[in-house]
A protein has these predicted regions:
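Feature captures the catalytic cores and cofactor-binding loops of soluble hydro-lyases/lyases
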Residues: 1-139, 156-159
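Short, charged beta-turn/beta-strand-edge "cap" motif at the junction between a beta-strand
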Residues: 136, 149-151
Length: 159
């Protein structure tokens, strides 16, 4: 993937820059891909279900409302994402099992970590408009993320 600064320099008028600092937890430090959106807080059932389906190298973006008291992604869900060909997972919230996540061949970015798991009541929505980090995202847009930050584009960017 081309570095984020290079994409910004070429496409500054066509992108949204994410203003939320995210940490990397998977083994891939930079990823890009078409977005698929999920909105769920305190319940990761929808995210787990989506990641159990074929991902076609997409990136699941989870708006967990920024909650820090429960983890949206752990090792088992992340392993399912790898098995089902997801390029990455972005979480406006927390993850857990970080020692296992760092060895998985996938990009995983989140606000932080917490050991507690979520409720399992099938609450949440998929394939909807979400907004965090000063950007608006819908399924079908593209996300680019590396150690420099992250950005959203309406379409795949080429350099």
């Amino acid at each position: 993937m081309t570095s984020l600064p290079d994409l910004f320099d070429q496409y500054s008028e066509q992108i949204q820059i994410g203003k939320l600092e995210l940490q990397s937890f998977g083994s891939r430090q930079s990823i890009s891909g078409e977005i698929y959106t999920v909105s769920c807080s305190d319940d990761n059932s929808i995210a787990k279900d989506v990641l159990s389906r074929e991902g076609n190298n997409k990136v699941l973006v989870i708006d967990a409302s920024g909650v820090t008291h429960a983890s949206m992604i752990g090792d088992q869900i992340a392993e399912s994402a790898v098995k089902n060909n997801w390029a990455g997972i972005i979480v406006n919230g927390c993850v857990r099992d970080v020692e296992d996540l760092k060895n998985l061949p996938i990009g995983i970015f989140a606000k932080g970590t917490v050991a507690q798991k979520t409720n399992k009541k099938n609450h949440g929505f998929e394939d909807i408009l979400i907004s965090f980090g000063s950007v608006v995202m819908t399924s079908g847009k593209w996300i680019y993320i590396d150690r420099n930050g992250w950005l959203i584009a309406d379409k795949k960017l080429e350099l």
